[in-house]
Amino acid sequence: MCSWCWAFKPIWQKILTSLPQNLTVEYLLGGLAPDNDNPMSPETRKFIMDNWRRVQDTVPATEFNYEFWRLNTPKRSTFIACRAVISARIQNPKFER
């Protein structure tokens, strides 16, 4: 998930509750990095962690799990997250939010 999307999720939830009932919100997914099994490079990992810190400085209530980087070997693919959202949507459309 985009770190800015994560940071602004509480605001987005407030916006959703204030929208007219007859307005339909559709979520569209797009992978930013090609689907592959390659581990994320150290440079990319640092770039993303630095971005997380920048987001936290800008939106202080935002929290990220930095243990993720120590406990996992992330892949350089955004399609994995997209497939997870699609799977959640198939189970229940409310889950994709």
Each language-model region and where it sits:
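Structural alpha/beta surface segment adjacent to cysteine/selenocysteine redox centers
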Residues: 10-97
